[in-house]
Amino acid sequence: MRTDNSGSKHEGISFVLFDMASPGVTTRPIKLISGSSPFCETFFDNVKAYKSNLIGEEGKGWAIAKYLLTHEREMISGFGAAPKKSVGQMALETIGSDATGRLANGVLRQTIAQYQLDTMVFGATMARVGDEAKAGQGLGAASSIFKYYGTELNKRRNELNMAALGEQALGWDGDEYRGGVVSRDWLRSKGNSIEGGTSEVQLNIIAKRVLGLPDA
């Protein structure tokens, strides 16, 4: 919350905890196209916050918020990690293999191969930066790189799952229907590039703090 208006917009912000059940706090779920409601909008109408719940120093809340955002983005980037059942496995089960044992759809096979290579590189990079963080080096803008690329990988994975299932991704009643989960995951993945800071925000951070590009 803002406790001082005399400085810049990033100064004068304090990090204060408050009870979400406090009078004046209203939370409304936002229903996504997947049908779930993991997002919400919160309204504050004359809500009281107490100085005894101040975290850190007064006026230094922005630094705390940035620290938390760094770790939130790192967590969200994990959506791009390889799932238990790979895209290739699902495609083989659905489409089948050719005489050489490879996925019968050659175009989809190449696309999946590129995705899997990108996932391996992403995992290795995350492991390296994780070791650097354990050694005392801060994540810095790397969290924005991970958040952007990890969520884009997750969207690619869900797109490939949908492509592999084809018409089976459409819903019907019956015990053999698997497409419901896949299509819902695909729809839900669109929110990954919004939560924790949109992909556009992450690209701006990368441009300024990593590449040193000037403001537009």
Question: Which residue stretches match the model-derived regions?
Answer:
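Tryptophan-centric aromatic hotspots in well-structured domains and transmembrane helices
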Residues: F15, F39, F43, W62-I64, ...
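Short glycine/proline-enriched turns and hinge-like loops at secondary-structure junctions
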Residues: K9-G12, S37, G56, T198-S199
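C-terminal helix-coil-helix/basic helical segment that borders enzyme active sites and/or dimer interfaces
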Residues: A99-R109, M120-D175
